[in-house]
Curated annotation (Swiss-Prot):
Pathway noted in the entry: Steroid biosynthesis; sterol biosynthesis
Listed cofactors: heme
The protein, known as: Cytochrome P450 710A4
Main localization, broad class: membrane
Gene it is expressed from: CYP710A4
Pfam assignment, any one: p450
InterPro entries listed in its UniProt record: Cyt_P450 (IPR001128), Cyt_P450_CS (IPR017972), Cyt_P450_E_grp-I (IPR002401), Cyt_P450_sf (IPR036396)
Positions with a binding annotation for heme: 435
Entry superkingdom: Eukaryota
UniProt similarity note: Belongs to the cytochrome P450 family.
Length: 493
C-alpha cells in the first residue's frame, strides 16, 4: 500500500506536466486553426463551449452569426474536442453543399450524427453508394406516387382537424399547437411511408422512440445507459428493426402482384422488377433510409406547419387571400379530397408555403465535416476534421427583396424571386444531398395551410417573446404557437 502511494506520488509531477502540456497544445491547435477568424480567444478545456450550446442553442448560434458579420461571413468555436466553423455567407454555404465528396466534405446532419444514426444512414453516404440509393429513392417522389401520398396525407390531416374541432373549436381555452401538429405529422409519415404494415401498438412505440431520438439530438453525446444520447441510440436501433419488418412484408406483398399503396411499396415494387436486385436494397438498408425520412418529415414538417399558423395569424391579408385561393377549388363541406391538378393551381397558397420555408427554414443549418483540408476562400483553408455549419437561415435573408418582410408575392410568376435568388433559397439544401422528398414536403405544407385555414379561425395568445426562435431541434416559436381555435363552418366533412 505504501509503495503504491509512493509510486503515485513520484508520478504525480509527470502526470500534471502531461495534463498541462495537453491543455496547452489544445489551446495552441485551436488558435492555429482559428487564425484571424472571429471566435473565442480561448476555449474551455476538452468540452469547449458545448454547455452554452445545450443551455441556449438560439443564443449560441445568434452570437456565431453576429461574429461572422465582422469577417468574410465566417466565425469559429470549439465543441467537445471539435473545431467548428459557422458559415453565414450564402455563396460560401453553397460551396460546401456542392462539394460533398471523399476529398472535400461529408454531410453529418448532427455534430455526432454518425454515432447517433448509424453507418447505413443515407445522410452519411457519398459517391457511388449515395448515387445508387438516390436512384432507387427518387422515383418514389414523382407524380404518380405523390398523387397517392396526397390522398393519404389529406385523410390524416382531415382526421386530426376534425378531432381539433371536437376538442378545441369552442374557443374557450387556448391550445399549444406544437404537440397537436407533431402528432399529425407523425401519423402522416407513418401512413404514407409504411402505413399498412403498422398496428396501433407499433405506432405508439414508434412515436415514443422518435421522441427519444429528438431529445438525443439536443443532448450531450454520452453513449452510456441512463443518458439521453445513449437512449436515443437504442431508439434508433429499435426503429430500424421495426422498419425492417415493414420492408419484408412489403416485398412479400409486391412479389404477390399487389398494387403499391405507400412509399415502401413503390420502392420494393421497383426492386423486385430488377434482376439482380440493386445495391443497398436489403431490408435493413432500406429501413435505415425510412428512419431518416420519418425523422426529417416529423420534426421539419412540425416546424414548417407551426410557422405557417404563426404567419397566417399575424398577416390577416395573407390569410384572406389563401382562403380565397383555396375556395376556388375546395370546401370542407364538399366531402371530396383536393386533386393533384387543384393543388397545382393553388398558386398563392403554394407561394405562402414557400415563403414560410424561406422565412423560417426548419433546419437552420446543416453540419458537414471536412474530410480533407479545403480552401474555402482566398485567405482561409478549412482544416481536415473541422465541423462546418452552413447556415440556411442566414442565407434566406440575403439577396431577397426586403428579406425581413414576410411577402409571399416574392414567389409570384411576376417576381420569381425563387429563381432570381435560387442560390439563397437553401431550405432543402443544394448539391448531391439536396432533399429528395422536397416535393412531398411542399405538398404536405400546402395541403395543411389550405385545409386548416379553411376550417378554422384562430387567434394567437400573445406573450413576451412568443415569436422567439427555439431549436427543439428544428426551429419553432418559443410558445409552441398557443392559439384559440374556433370552427369557421357549422359543418365539416
Amino acid at each position: 500500500m505504501v509503495s503504491s502511494v509512493s509510486l503515485f506520488a513520484s508520478l504525480t509531477p509527470y502526470l500534471v506536466s502531461a495534463l498541462l502540456l495537453f491543455l496547452l497544445l489544445e489551446q495552441l491547435f485551436y488558435r492555429v486553426k482559428k487564425r484571424n477568424l472571429p471566435g473565442p480567444l480561448f476555449v474551455f478545456p476538452i468540452i469547449g463551449n458545448v454547455v452554452a450550446l445545450i443551455r441556449d442553442p438560439t443564443s449560441f448560434w445568434d452570437k456565431q452569426s453576429a461574429m461572422a458579420d465582422t469577417s468574410v461571413g465566417l466565425s469559429v468555436n470549439y465543441l467537445i474536442g471539435k473545431f467548428i466553423i459557422y458559415i453565414k455567407d450564402a455563396e460560401l454555404s453553397n460551396k460546401v453543399l456542392s462539394n460533398i465528396r471523399p476529398d472535400a466534405f461529408q454531410l453529418t446532419g448532427h455534430p455526432f450524427g454518425k454515432k447517433l444514426f448509424g453507418d447505413h444512414s443515407l445522410i452519411f453516404m457519398f459517391g457511388e453508394d449515395h448515387k445508387s440509393v438516390r436512384r432507387q429513392v427518387a422515383p418514389n417522389f414523382t407524380r404518380k406516387p405523390l398523387s397517392a401520398y396526397s390522398s393519404l396525407q389529406q385523410i390524416v390531416i382531415l382526421r386530426h382537424l376534425r378531432q381539433w374541432e371536437e376538442s378545441f373549436s369552442s374557443g374557450s381555452r387556448p391550445v399549444s399547437m406544437r404537440q397537436l401538429i407533431r402528432e399529425l405529422n407523425l401519423e402522416t409519415s407513418q401512413t404514407v411511408f409504411v402505413g399498412p404494415y403498422l398496428d396501433k401498438e407499433v405506432k405508439k412505440t414508434i412515436c415514443d422512440d422518435y421522441s427519444l431520438l429528438t431529445l438525443g439530438t439536443m443532448a450531450i453525446p454520452i453513449d452510456l445507459p441512463g443518458f439521453t444520447f445513449g437512449e436515443a441510440r437504442q431508439a434508433v436501433s429499435r426503429l430500424v428493426n421495426t422498419m425492417s419488418v415493414c420492408v419484408g412484408k412489403s416485398k412479400a406483398k409486391m412479389a404477390a402482384g399487389e398494387n403499391p399503396t405507400c412509399l415502401v411499396d413503390f420502392w420494393t415494387h421497383s426492386i423486385i422488377e430488377e434482376n439482380p436486385p440493386p445495391p443497398h436494397s436489403k431490408d435493413k438498408e432500406i429501413s435505415c433510409v425510412l428512419v431518416d425520412f420519418m425523422f426529417a418529415s416529423q420534426d421539419a414538417s412540425t416546424s414548417s406547419l407551426l410557422w405557417a399558423v404563426v404567419m397566417l395569424e399575424s398577416e390577416p391579408e395573407v390569410l384572406r387571400r389563401v382562403r380565397e385561393d383555396v375556395a376556388r377549388f375546395w370546401s370542407s363541406e364538399s366531402n371530396e379530397l383536393i386533386t393533384a391538378d387543384q393543388l397545382a393551381e393553388m398558386k398563392y397558397t403554394r407561394a405562402v408555403a414557400r415563403e414560410v420555408l424561406r422565412y423560417r427554414p426548419p433546419a437552420s443549418m446543416i453540419p458537414h465535416v471536412a474530410v480533407s483540408d479545403f480552401r474555402l476562400t482566398e485567405s482561409y483553408t478549412i482544416p481536415k476534421g473541422t465541423i462546418v455549419f452552413p447556415s440556411l437561415f442566414d442565407a434566406s435573408f440575403q439577396g431577397f427583396t426586403e428579406p425581413d418582410r414576410f411577402d409571399p408575392d416574392r414567389f409570384s410568376e411576376t417576381r420569381q424571386e425563387d429563381e432570381v435568388f435560387k442560390r439563397n433559397f437553401l431550405t432543402f439544401g443544394n448539391g448531391s444531398h439536396q432533399c429528395v422528398g422536397q416535393r412531398y414536403a411542399m405538398n404536405h405544407l400546402v395541403l395543411f395551410i389550405a385545409m386548416f385555414s379553411s376550417m378554422f379561425d384562430f387567434k394567437r395568445v400573445r406573450s413576451d417573446g412568443c415569436d422567439d426562435i427555439v431549436h427543439i431541434p428544428t426551429m419553432s416559436p418559443k410558445d409552441g404557437c398557443t392559439v384559440f381555435l374556433s370552427s369557421r363552418l357549422v359543418t365539416s366533412p
